[in-house]
Amino acid sequence: MEKGTEALNSKVDKFQRATPNTVLVDSILLPSKLKLALTTLIFVIVLLIGLGNPGGILAQEASEDSGLEDALSGFDDEASADEDDALSGFDDGTDESGSAEDTDATEEEASWKQAFSGFSGSTGFSASYSFAKEAPADATQADWSGLTKLRPYFSLTWDAKLGENWKTRISGKAFYDFAYGMKDRETFSEEVLSELEKEAELREFYLEGSPFGSLDIKLGKQIVAWGVANSLRVVDVLNPTDSREFGMTDLEDVRLPIAMTKLDYYLGDFKLEAVAVHQIEFNKSPPFGSDYNPSTQVITEVIQESSSENTEYGLALIGTFSGWDASLHWAQYYDDSAHFKITKITVIPGVGAVPTLEQRHSRLTMGGATLSIPSGNFLWKAEAAKLQGMEFALVTDKTFARTDALVGTEYSGWSDTSLTLEFGVQHINDFDVTLEASPDSQLEDRIATTVSFMQDYINQTLHLSMFGMMIGKSGQDGGLNRMSLEYDVMDAFSVTGGVMLYQTGDNAYFQSLNENDRLFFDARYSF
């Protein structure tokens, strides 16, 4: 099956696509000194807020006691026995009828309450404003400056128990973006309007239960998150991701649920996990014409059919021990990130050889392991994996293997604060320098470093989140930075605002994001 999709001038690897909330490096469009001063000023203001006396939050709990009075019984003692006998039959019938009706009504009310108690969700709207990009001089071109998103959204989840050992979940989400209608809508590509203007989709939809004590089974659309890393992906290969707005979403929110069968067998300190992925679905990439897609042409993406022959498989042995955890992982799957394949070359006079490209997905085999060790206020973690079967456009006579490794730590010794550092490297074994040229644009070693800082203020109602990622030993291949503040107006209502800055570098894709710096805002009501 073929699907029309966009081609990126430079493929962004999984280290770059699995990016969460971010922030603190300079973008290119504003002068670096000004950006550094702006970021520092914001950070200092937030810290001053945190050092002040926190405000108090009063919580009130109310309870009501209600009861039913016993029905008054007894009639006039002076009434004749005949009257009592005659009336007693009607009284008994009335009591039985009333009692049955009350019981049925109570059971029906309890049933409705139980059904609706499983519903949860959120609604709100999100907005973003691109302050670095200028409006195009040509009015026929899409305008990605200024307001780029004004999106009301709604999500709903239903959880229900089915007997003692089974439960189900059904969730979905929908949005509509008014920003395109507020500009010249016809200047945006069909792909952008189709994928970014509106969406309604079913997300998680599964049945989960335990046929007997040591075995759990989960059937349906679900997410299986492997690994111990927060922001970089090594052994976490089963679920595709949504990277249409690169870097704007946390890793836990960016995974896409797909149809799987998962079996978990428990034996002492170990869990053996077996997964069969029935639905072949790949990453949601920025559509052609998006400000996150610099491609000038649409390139066909070849997508494998969801069939028994193309089923993906995964195995994991997870051990939870006293003082440390470890796991072993194996998977045979299709790479969620596409590679280019040259299908033909056309020689154009005065231009030269012009290749015709397709996007393909390689069948990969992964073997890996993870380790996490808590030590005081630190949590040390590591992941490593070897991927085999990688294909590229410029070297077609063999496949390649790649070794991925990650080390990181989380520190939680400060009150209401967490700090996370992660360092990852991808090494292509037996590297061929031919792969450095376009369209492959590969490096023998690709390094990524991430820093995440989160802190709560004012009785945990104000939440600061900062994230920074750099690609390359010193960020020479690009990076991104994001800072946000979330305030809980009340228990169920929160507002969030922040700034996103992209750092350019030698990588062509990050160079294309140079003018994508933006402010963002979100208001959310949860129920």
Walk through the language-model features, giving the residues of each.
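Outer-membrane beta-barrel "beta-signal"
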Residues: 243, 267, 501, 513-527
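Detector for outer-membrane/organellar transmembrane beta-barrel domains
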Residues: 164, 331, 372-392, 396-470
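Transmembrane beta-strands of outer-membrane beta-barrel pores
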Residues: 125-133, 174-178, 223-225, 267-269, ...
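N-terminal periplasmic/intermembrane-space "pro-region" immediately following the signal or transit peptide
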Residues: 55-167, 171, 179-180, 194, ...
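Outer membrane beta-barrel
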Residues: 164-293, 322, 502-504
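Residues on the lipid-exposed face of transmembrane beta-strands in outer-membrane beta-barrel proteins
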Residues: 125, 152-160, 170, 204-209, ...
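Repeated loop/turn-to-beta-strand initiation elements of outer-membrane beta-barrel proteins
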Residues: 165-168, 214-217, 269-272, 323-326, ...
